[in-house]
Amino acid sequence: MRMSTTTEIIAHHWAFAVFLIGAVGLCGLMLLGAYFLGGRAQARAKNVPYESGIDSVGSARMRLSAKFYLVAMFFVIFDVEALYLYAWSISIRESGWIGFIEAAIFILVLLAGLFYLVRIGALDWTPTRSNRRVSKPSTVRYASSHPQDISQELSVAGSQQANESR
């Protein structure tokens, strides 16, 4: 006598379903326990970063370049690929020539991705140069740091621009 498909699926996968329900239930139980048993003190300095007993100076937030995040993502990607190559190198005798060809194709795809990243400049850390050109290099002057000199230079530059526009 043959079982129906739903009964067959339940018979084969009941252990996984019990495991999944148990894992989700345990996570929920721990979250609820932390919510009910956790402290709720609201002090003035609760959210202030601790700096070895010294009063904090400035903000703890730093703006980082997006290139750092790109490098982190590239590291994770190439690290996972190295993991796959390590698994292949352990089973090289069992995989034979077919496994070698597949690993060679995998390495070629990695190299193509690396060359693409280099080509689009994702790994270039030098600052980009501005394409702006100064129209009249003779009018460029070094400004003084004294406030009176700066205001005089601005008024002279404004009158020169007004004369040029006429």
From Swiss-Prot:
Reactions this protein catalyses: a quinone + NADH + 5 H(+)(in) = a quinol + NAD(+) + 4 H(+)(out)
Gene3D superfamilies, sorted: NADH:ubiquinone/plastoquinone oxidoreductase, chain 3
Cellular component terms per the entry's GO annotation: plasma membrane; respiratory chain complex I
Assigned keywords, A-Z: Cell inner membrane, Cell membrane, Membrane, NAD, Quinone, Translocase, Transmembrane, Transmembrane helix, Transport, Ubiquinone
Bilayer disposition of the protein: Multi-pass membrane protein
Region (Disordered): 141-166
Stored InterPro entries: NAD(P)H_OxRDtase_bac/plastid (IPR023043), NADH_UbQ/plastoQ_OxRdtase_su3 (IPR000440), NDAH_ubi_oxred_su3_sf (IPR038430)
Keyword Acetylation: no
Localization terms from the record: Cell inner membrane
Enzyme Commission number(s): 7.1.1.-
Enzyme class: translocase
Regions that span the bilayer: 16-36, 68-88, 98-118
GO molecular function: NADH dehydrogenase (ubiquinone) activity; NADH:ubiquinone reductase (non-electrogenic) activity; quinone binding
Pfam family of the protein (one): Oxidored_q4
Similarity section: Belongs to the complex I subunit 3 family.
Subunit structure: NDH-1 is composed of 13 different subunits. Subunits NuoA, H, J, K, L, M, N constitute the membrane sector of the complex.
Annotated function: NDH-1 shuttles electrons from NADH, via FMN and iron-sulfur (Fe-S) centers, to quinones in the respiratory chain. The immediate electron acceptor for the enzyme in this species is believed to be ubiquinone. Couples the redox reaction to proton translocation (for every two electrons transferred, four hydrogen ions are translocated across the cytoplasmic membrane), and thus conserves the redox energy in a proton gradient.
Official protein name in the record: NADH-quinone oxidoreductase subunit A
Gene that this polypeptide is encoded by: nuoA
